[in-house]
Curated annotation (Swiss-Prot):
Any GO MF annotation of the entry: structural constituent of ribosome
SUPFAM superfamilies the record matches: Ribosomal L27 protein-like
Cystine residue pairs: none
Region entry Disordered, spans: 1-21
Family the UniProt entry places it in: Belongs to the bacterial ribosomal protein bL27 family.
GO CC annotations, alphabetized: cytosolic large ribosomal subunit
Name this polypeptide is given: Large ribosomal subunit protein bL27
GO annotation (BP), single: translation
Keywords: Ribonucleoprotein, Ribosomal protein
Keyword Ribonucleoprotein annotated: yes
Gene giving rise to this polypeptide: rpmA
Any single Pfam family the record assigns to this protein: Ribosomal_L27
Entries under InterPro entries matching the protein: Ribosomal_bL27, Ribosomal_bL27_CS
Length: 89
């Protein structure tokens, strides 16, 4: 009598969801206080002027202004440059 042994179950088939990391506000974009500029694991980008860093390394704007990227000594910094107030006409 021919018998077929029971098939074992696969131990694969799992994967985690994407975490939606990356730049959320690119260079030249206007931001307001609290806007998230970048989500990251570790410090791929470092906070520059007027940028804060959360406990999960999220970078966020502290003031209203324009996002700027600049590299210095093997690090990329993200800053927010304030926009000059427009003169009343």
């Amino acid at each position: 009598m021919a018998h077929k042994k029971a098939g074992g179950s696969s131990r694969n088939g799992r994967d985690s969801k994407g975490k939606r990391l990356g730049i959320k506000a690119f260079g030249g974009e206007r931001v307001i206080p609290g806007n998230i500029i970048a989500r990251q694991r570790g410090t791929t980008w470092h906070p520059g002027l007027n940028v804060g860093m959360g406990t999960d390394h999220t970078l966020f704007a502290k003031i209203e202004g324009v996002v700027e990227f600049h590299a210095r000594a093997n690090r990329t910094f993200i800053s927010v440059r304030p926009v000059a107030a427009q003169a009343a006409e």
